[in-house]
């Protein structure tokens, strides 16, 4: 097979038109509508009508103005009584301000605070000084933290939530 080299055309537009006339594909005979080339919208496909009966309500400075405007339009349209906003919020404001929260309240609960002699939990009769894991057959296992020591000194067999998982399994 021999290949021939065609000289470059002087006018590209005319050259392309000549090639299209020689080739003449079937798709050139198809007629397309003169509308927009974009695909149809969902409104066109499903015959959905847009509801434009509600007028646009702009933002206003006062809620009272919005209440009177909306009540006038709803009473005339549907006959329903308008909903009114109570003058005072039924939810009381939160009394805690950021200034009243102490730094101690923001500490992690796993870091146990140390109690001094003036604290009501740490009394003079307290013998608990450090973390310990002792077993007394008459009392049972004792896992040490300041909260557990307070309850155990009062003859209450209780463990705090941090010491409970450390305790031995009871059968």
From Swiss-Prot:
GO CC list: host cell nucleus
ZnF unnamed span: 145-163
Compositionally biased residues, Pro residues: 84-96
Motif (Nuclear localization signal): 166-171
Subcellular location: Host nucleus
Keyword Transcription regulation annotated: yes
GO molecular function: zinc ion binding
Region spans: Disordered: 67-96
GO terms (BP aspect): regulation of DNA-templated transcription; symbiont-mediated perturbation of host cell cycle G1/S transition checkpoint; symbiont-mediated suppression of host innate immune response; symbiont-mediated suppression of host JAK-STAT cascade via inhibition of STAT1 activity; symbiont-mediated suppression of host type I interferon-mediated signaling pathway
Keywords: Activator, Early protein, G1/S host cell cycle checkpoint dysregulation by virus, Host nucleus, Host-virus interaction, Inhibition of host innate immune response by virus, Inhibition of host interferon signaling pathway by virus, Inhibition of host STAT1 by virus, Interferon antiviral system evasion, Metal-binding, Modulation of host cell cycle by virus, Transcription, Transcription regulation, Viral immunoevasion, Zinc, Zinc-finger
Family stated for the protein in its record: Belongs to the adenoviridae E1A protein family.
Function of the protein: Plays a role in viral genome replication by driving entry of quiescent cells into the cell cycle. Stimulation of progression from G1 to S phase allows the virus to efficiently use the cellular DNA replicating machinery to achieve viral genome replication. E1A protein has both transforming and trans-activating activities. Induces the disassembly of the E2F1 transcription factor from RB1 by direct competition for the same binding site on RB1, with subsequent transcriptional activation of E2F1-regulated S-phase genes and of the E2 region of the adenoviral genome.
Subunit description: Interacts with host UBE2I; this interaction interferes with polySUMOylation. Interacts with host RB1; this interaction induces the aberrant dissociation of RB1-E2F1 complex thereby disrupting the activity of RB1 and activating E2F1-regulated genes. Interacts with host ATF7; the interaction enhances ATF7-mediated viral transactivation activity which requires the zinc binding domains of both proteins.
Protein name per its UniProtKB record: Early E1A protein
């Amino acid at each position: 097979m021999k290949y021939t080299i065609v000289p470059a055309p002087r006018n590209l537009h005319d050259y392309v038109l000549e090639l299209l006339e020689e080739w003449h594909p079937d798709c050139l005979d198809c007629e397309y509508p003169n509308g927009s080339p974009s695909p149809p919208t969902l409104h066109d496909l499903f015959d959905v009508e847009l509801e434009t009966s509600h007028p646009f309500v702009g933002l206003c400075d006062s809620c009272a103005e919005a209440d009177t405007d909306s009540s006038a339009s709803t009473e005339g349209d549907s006959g329903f009584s308008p909903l009114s906003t109570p003058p005072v919020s039924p939810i009381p404001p939160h009394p805690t301000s950021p200034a009243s929260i102490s730094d101690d309240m923001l500490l992690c609960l796993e870091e146990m605070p140390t109690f001094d002699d003036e604290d009501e939990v740490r009394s003079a009769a307290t013998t608990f000084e450090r973390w310990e894991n002792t077993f007394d057959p008459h009392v049972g296992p004792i896992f040490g933290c300041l909260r557990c020591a307070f309850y155990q000194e009062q003859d209450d067999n209780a463990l705090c939530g941090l010491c409970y998982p450390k305790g031995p399994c009871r059968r």
